[in-house]
């Protein structure tokens, strides 16, 4: 998959297009977790970041970064498809992650169809969502606790006394 890819049969198999400058930035970012801190060409650094390049705190160091293959993914936000909004660069390809990749990281089933017509709307749905698997596990734990409390003869509700 390349930057700017669009699958007409499934909008989720879409990646954001990149400007020539952002393509250069990403090409110079190491695979598997690289950041813009390694860029030797400071003309590619945004002015706001230049003065902080060698600072220990390295302000906003995740922006234009690549994801890692073997580490937890960053928080999937509503703008995860955009390279300039966090560590959303693909670990080994010169592009940001696709909508489907973001949805998969959020634990949406691969066959899930998002009812939206734009990249922005779909990414907002994905980024604002409670991950479905997390919701399932919380619901299961609440149900099990309710059943257990009922079996023990507790008459009150699950949250009584809190």
Where are these regions (language model features)?
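C-terminal target-recognition/interaction regions appended to catalytic cores
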Residues: 1-162
């Amino acid at each position: 998959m390349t930057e700017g890819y669009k699958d007409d049969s499934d909008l989720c198999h879409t990646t954001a297009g990149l400007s020539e400058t952002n393509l250069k930035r990403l090409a110079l970012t190491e695979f598997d977790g690289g950041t813009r801190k390694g860029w030797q060409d400071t003309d590619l650094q945004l002015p706001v970041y230049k003065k902080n390049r060698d600072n220990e705190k390295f302000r906003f160091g995740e922006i234009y970064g690549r994801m890692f293959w073997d580490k937890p993914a960053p928080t999937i936000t509503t703008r995860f498809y955009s390279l300039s909004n966090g560590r959303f660069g693909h670990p080994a390809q010169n592009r940001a992650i696709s909508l489907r990749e973001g949805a998969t990281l959020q634990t949406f089933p691969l066959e899930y169809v998002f009812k939206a017509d734009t990249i922005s709307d779909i990414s907002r749905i994905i980024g604002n969502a409670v991950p479905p698997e997390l919701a399932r596990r919380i619901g299961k734990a609440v149900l099990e606790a309710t059943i257990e409390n009922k079996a023990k003869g507790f008459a009150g509700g699950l949250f009584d006394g809190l």
